[in-house]
């Protein structure tokens, strides 16, 4: 009987408030530096949301052809730029692809193309329907990034979009890994968001979990007694997943293995109930990865920044990991960039991958007084040799997801 196919990460591309490219992103994350700042987008000044994680110095025209720019929103610009970075990192060119049907694309998105949509709606109401551009019909849609990435790359394998709230980013990677295990050679997967246009910001005002603080140093402090919610962010990450044997044959480095995943649903803003749902997802993901609780070397927490939600997450870790929950390092680097909705967890996956490679666990910015029974990494990066990382994500609408990464193509624990 042949060994089961395994999906490994061979390429990583990041566009985030910490910067563009994995190296720049990692340097800022490991230093514990915060990229949160007052929102400087035109039209947002009167809104009660004051702080966000904004991608600096992003020039889509320098990274994406004009043909695609006129058809797409900022969230798709992020996705296309991050995809090219990931393909370059994987050293995967068109010449390396045997058939266009051997490459698929899976993304997740929550906010869609709000910036493009707002611009066209303003034309509709200010000038009339004949001034609305034809690309409004596709640019706002959640599937736009998957479609444009596949068209640009000529990828004709299985493509899809995951709609699973903030947990969608992890679920997209799991969906991609499943496609690889079922026979697809390569899948480009990840998530990006651009939720900071005025229209998008107004749509978020109904979330009670959002922080209204106007102080970048106090607006997002998960797992503390002063936690007052989270701040939004833009950006995201894309990955190249390949079948392990095929990656090895072409000389690609297996940076990590997508070892296990599970998802549950516990209802919108039901944070006490999320404890059981998240614990079940953790236990199932570990079982599917062939890991025991004590095999987990680092946890990248969901870290919502809402007291009830943080408490539920800490208790879920205790339920799923037992005594090991008090010993395993836990971190939430997203406190320095904000929560990019569907893309928040894939940025955590990027950080986890880099943490395993650099043997450093980045700290949780803005946090000093941890009020939960966790070994939360704060202040400065912690030297470690993590081989197994657990990444967690929960959505405001009730989705819970857990993903297990193993360093390189290392065999699973016995």
Curated annotation (Swiss-Prot):
Pfam family, one: Ketoacyl-synt_C
Organism lineage: Bacteria, Bacillati, Actinomycetota, Actinomycetes, Kitasatosporales
Keyword Protease appears in the UniProt entry: no
Gene this chain is encoded by: sch2
Note: This putative ketoacyl synthase lacks the active site cysteine.
Summary of the function given for this chain in its UniProt record: Involved in developmentally regulated synthesis of a compound biosynthetically related to polyketide antibiotics which is essential for spore color in Streptomyces halstedii.
UniProt cross-references to InterPro entries, sorted A to Z: Beta-ketoacyl_synthase (IPR000794), Ketoacyl_synth_C (IPR014031), Ketoacyl_synth_N (IPR014030), PKS_Beta-ketoAc_synthase_dom (IPR020841), Thiolase-like (IPR016039)
Protein name from the UniProt record: Putative polyketide beta-ketoacyl synthase 2
Enzyme Commission designation: 2.3.1.-
Family membership noted in the UniProt record: Belongs to the thiolase-like superfamily. Beta-ketoacyl-ACP synthases family.
GO molecular function, one term: 3-oxoacyl-[acyl-carrier-protein] synthase activity
Class of this enzyme: transferase
UniProt keyword terms in alphabetical order: Acyltransferase, Transferase
GO BP term, pick one: fatty acid biosynthetic process
Domain Ketosynthase family 3 (KS3) per the UniProt entry, residue ranges: 4-407
């Amino acid at each position: 009987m042949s060994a089961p196919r395994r999906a490994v990460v061979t390429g990583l591309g990041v566009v985030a408030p910490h910067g563009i490219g994995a190296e720049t992103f990692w340097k800022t994350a490991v230093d514990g530096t915060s990229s949160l700042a007052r929102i400087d987008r035109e039209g947002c000044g009167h809104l009660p949301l004051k702080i966000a994680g904004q991608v600096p110095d992003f020039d889509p025209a320098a990274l994406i052809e004009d043909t695609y720019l006129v058809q797409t929103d900022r969230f798709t610009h992020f996705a296309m730029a991050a995809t090219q970075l990931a393909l370059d990192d994987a050293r995967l060119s068109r010449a390396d692809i045997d058939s266009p049907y051997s490459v698929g694309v899976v993304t997740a998105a929550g906010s869609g193309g709000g910036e493009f949509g707002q611009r066209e709606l303003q034309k509709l109401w200010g000038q009339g329907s004949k001034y609305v551009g034809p690309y409004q019909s596709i640019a706002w849609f959640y599937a736009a990034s998957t479609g444009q990435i596949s068209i640009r790359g000529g990828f004709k394998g299985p493509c899809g979009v995951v709609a699973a709230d903030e947990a969608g980013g992890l679920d997209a990677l799991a969906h991609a890994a499943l496609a690889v295990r079922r026979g697809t050679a390569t899948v480009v997967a990840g998530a990006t968001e651009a939720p900071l246009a005025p229209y998008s910001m107004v749509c978020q005002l109904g979330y009670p979990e959002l922080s209204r603080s106007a102080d970048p140093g106090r607006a997002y402090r998960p797992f503390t007694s002063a936690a007052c919610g989270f701040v939004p962010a833009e950006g995201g990450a894309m990955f190249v997943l390949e079948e392990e044997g095929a990656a090895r044959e072409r000389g690609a480095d297996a940076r990590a293995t997508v070892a296990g995943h599970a998802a549950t649903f516990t209802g919108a803003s039901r944070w006490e109930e999320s404890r059981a749902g998240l614990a079940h997802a953790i236990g199932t993901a570990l079982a599917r990865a062939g890991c025991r609780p004590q095999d987990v070397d680092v946890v990248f927490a969901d870290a919502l920044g809402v007291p009830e939600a943080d408490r539920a997450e800490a208790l879920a870790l205790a339920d799923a990991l037992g005594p090991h929950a008090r010993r395993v390092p836990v971190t939430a680097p997203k406190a320095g960039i904000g929560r990019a909705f569907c893309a928040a967890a894939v940025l955590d996956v990027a950080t986890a991958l880099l943490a395993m490679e650099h043997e450093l666990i980045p700290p949780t910015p803005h946090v000093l007084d941890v009020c939960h029974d966790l070994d939360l990494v704060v202040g400065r990066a912690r030297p470690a040799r993590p081989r197994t990382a657990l990444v967690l994500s929960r959505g405001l609408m009730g989705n819970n997801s857990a993903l297990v990464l193993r360093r390189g193509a290392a065999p699973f624990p016995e």
